[in-house]
Amino acid sequence: METLFNGTLALVGRDQESTGFAWWAGNARLINLSGKLLGAHVAHAGLIVFWAGAMNLFEVAHFVPEKPMYEQGLILLPHLATLGWGVGPGGEVLDTFPYFVSGVLHLISSAVLGFGGIYHALLGPETLEESFPFFGYVWKDRNKMTTILGIHLILLGIGAFLLVFKALYFGGVYDTWAPGGGDVRKISNLTLSPSILFGYLLKSPFGGEGWIVSVDDLEDIIGGHVWLGSICIFGGIWHILTKPFAWARRALVWSGEAYLSYSLAAISVFGFIACCFVWFNNTAYPSEFYGPTGPEASQAQAFTFLVRDQRLGANVGSAQGPTGLGKYLMRSPTGEVIFGGETMRFWDLRAPWLEPLRGPNGLDLSRLKKDIQPWQERRSAEYMTHAPLGSLNSVGGVATEINAVNYVSPRSWLATSHFVLGFFFFVGHLWHAGRARAAAAGFEKGIDRDFEPVLSMTPLN
């Protein structure tokens, strides 16, 4: 039986006989064809950038300025707004034109990348080694591989510095902690102290420690990008100028599939970190655009009812709840005054609408009685009703909505998708690392194509 993929219709270099890989193995057919593999990668970049541009314009077309971004299911406009484009005090969108420009620029770029991808996949030289030796490579060439690694690191470093320059010189970025409820501002005094910045890496990942995810001021974030950008650029230069040391030559597997597995592992780690960042961090991901974090929504509900009942005459400092603990306020394990009730589990939340009400020992009773501002009440009521939760129970006491309410927080989408993708990339890492190590050790067998069970079965037709 002849199919499109195993008969005379197949092009040489794309069929199983000439490459050793079936059609569905994708780029594996191009392992030794550097020109064609370049085409596949450039075309893939074109698809990615096309999605970014098209989705960007789709979100602009559907955007309603009267509603917060997180109520509209947006995931790209919040990123642009966080970079300070088109927004003003309180995260209010003043101008959607920068978002339109972003979408169009990505679409134009994707056309260029798409053309380059098709050119290199179909028309360009199959291999680059002969005509363009700078761009050519052999997977086993350790020196060339570390040079390519160095170039990638320099490009990543430049990317980190682009954010730094945007924050310092080109209009600034959105700071959710700006007084009065957030605003766009230029970052002036960067944190460059290594003890502070690398201290984040040494913190525990649990509770109020929160590892690097606990960063809560833009000076630290932008200063961290200065350090990271510098490390990437200098590390890139170092990798270009040096050859791998003997221990690295011995310890690592030097093949295309091994490099794929290393990359998948790195992206998996990035995915898990991004998941935690978007779920817990309301500085890098301001709640004005992404909606409140889970702990933030829970604390906002406690705050909203404290405000309500205090107006109705409750003494919030001494009222007892059903468990004998404070109904509105209680003490944390370390003695701070915190919100009572089920939200006690989130007592280490920090949020811009709540911090002005804290004193040296936690929430300040006199400020809660005299200093609560209308914008704090409005924001907490809004956050209370937009928790990033699709759960029916055990949600920190937050009143969950009935099924008729059509709201899913972008935090839920972004955290869940990055967790799932991070997990699958990790599985991909294990798979390709195992294959690469087996091939290097010389016992890679694969499926025996000569005695595959399906070959002895009656054809379907």
Curated annotation (Swiss-Prot):
Q: How is this protein organized at the quaternary level?
A: PSII is composed of 1 copy each of membrane proteins PsbA, PsbB, PsbC, PsbD, PsbE, PsbF, PsbH, PsbI, PsbJ, PsbK, PsbL, PsbM, PsbT, PsbX, PsbY, PsbZ, Psb30/Ycf12, at least 3 peripheral proteins of the oxygen-evolving complex and a large number of cofactors. It forms dimeric complexes.
- What is the cofactor note? Binds multiple chlorophylls and provides some of the ligands for the Ca-4Mn-5O cluster of the oxygen-evolving complex. It may also provide a ligand for a Cl- that is required for oxygen evolution. PSII binds additional chlorophylls, carotenoids and specific lipids.
GO CC annotation? chloroplast thylakoid membrane; photosystem II
On whether Membrane is a keyword of this UniProt record, the answer is: yes
Q: Which residues bind [CaMn4O5] cluster?
A: 355
Question: Which GO terms of the molecular function aspect are on file?
Answer: chlorophyll binding; electron transporter, transferring electrons within the cyclic electron transport pathway of photosynthesis activity; metal ion binding
Q: Name one Pfam family in it.
A: PSII
Q: Where in the cell is the protein located?
A: Plastid, Chloroplast thylakoid membrane
* Protein family: Belongs to the PsbB/PsbC family. PsbC subfamily.
Q: Which GO terms describe its biological process?
A: photosynthetic electron transport in photosystem II
Q: Which residues cross the membrane?
A: 57-81, 122-143, 166-188, 243-263, 279-300, 435-459
Chain positions found as Phosphothreonine: 3
Membrane topology, from the record: Multi-pass membrane protein
Q: Which residues carry this modification: N-acetylthreonine?
A: 3
Q: Which keywords annotate this record?
A: Acetylation, Chlorophyll, Chloroplast, Chromophore, Manganese, Membrane, Metal-binding, Phosphoprotein, Photosynthesis, Photosystem II, Plastid, Thylakoid, Transmembrane, Transmembrane helix
| Stated role | One of the components of the core complex of photosystem II (PSII). It binds chlorophyll and helps catalyze the primary light-induced photochemical processes of PSII. PSII is a light-driven water:plastoquinone oxidoreductase, using light energy to abstract electrons from H(2)O, generating O(2) and a proton gradient subsequently used for ATP formation.
Top-rank lineage group of the source organism = Eukaryota
Q: Which residues are part of the propeptide segment?
A: 1-2
Identify this protein by name.
Photosystem II CP43 reaction center protein
UniProt cross-references to Gene3D superfamilies, sorted A to Z:
photosystem ii from thermosynechococcus elongatus
Does the keyword field hold Phosphoprotein? yes
